[in-house]
């Protein structure tokens, strides 16, 4: 309260409102109708909307598939690997190791094909709307590893480390309908929410936002769809 009465406030913009949620009344107000940038308080809106729509048991998923045929006698996959990104901000090198291990454990030592990243989970926007151009923010790809946009390169290296030889190339391509699921890596919405809210991590918040947009299996989902969910929620609750 002493700081709020400070002469400094005569020359800066400050707006404060403290609300008692139990009694549903304001406890303190200071220039409460002054328009201010909401900044990271909007993460609360995204968190509430996502929990309402997807539930507290929702998982962020990254799926690895294969196509073609595995020759058991030579341990050769005559086909391709596809990794379908689900915009899991917690996907890490350890997940790639387990994915490569799953390939090896399927009895594959050589891949006569390619490794593809399926990025159709979200639109092509690579920066969040309103982000400053000079901020150190990560690329908004649905398939980041340790926050970096280098999945196919790093996964091919992990395959090599596991003794799996890739004789093809790497690239981007959407999953074909005849692909077979090989393994899935997941992180819970609770894990993502913890860092998103405690550290105010923009990547985690954008990832949460796009889970709303892609709800129901929509491909190339855009931010506009997620905003519609948020608008509908707050219209409902007033």
Residues covered by each model-derived region:
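Hydrophobic alpha-helix position signal
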Residues: 1-4, 51, 103, 159, ...
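Beta-lactamase-like hydrolase cores
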Residues: 1-22, 26-35, 98-107
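Extracytoplasmic
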Residues: 11-13, 31-33, 39-42, 57-59, ...
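Solvent-exposed loop/turn segments at secondary-structure junctions
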Residues: 22-23, 34-37, 70-71, 87-91, ...
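Active-site SXXK
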Residues: 24, 38-56, 115, 154-159, ...
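Short, well-structured active-site flanking segments
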Residues: 52-67, 163-171
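Active-site-adjacent, His/Asp/Glu-enriched structural segments that form or flank metal-binding
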Residues: 59-124, 131-138, 144-146
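A small/polar active-site loop signature that marks catalytic segments
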Residues: 148-238
